[in-house]
Amino acid sequence: LLLDPXXGDK
């Protein structure tokens, strides 16, 4: 997800 601290590109 966009708000996910992990990737941010999904």
UniProtKB/Swiss-Prot annotation:
Protein name: Unknown protein 3
Native organism taxonomy: Eukaryota, Viridiplantae, Streptophyta, Embryophyta, Tracheophyta
UniProt superkingdom: Eukaryota
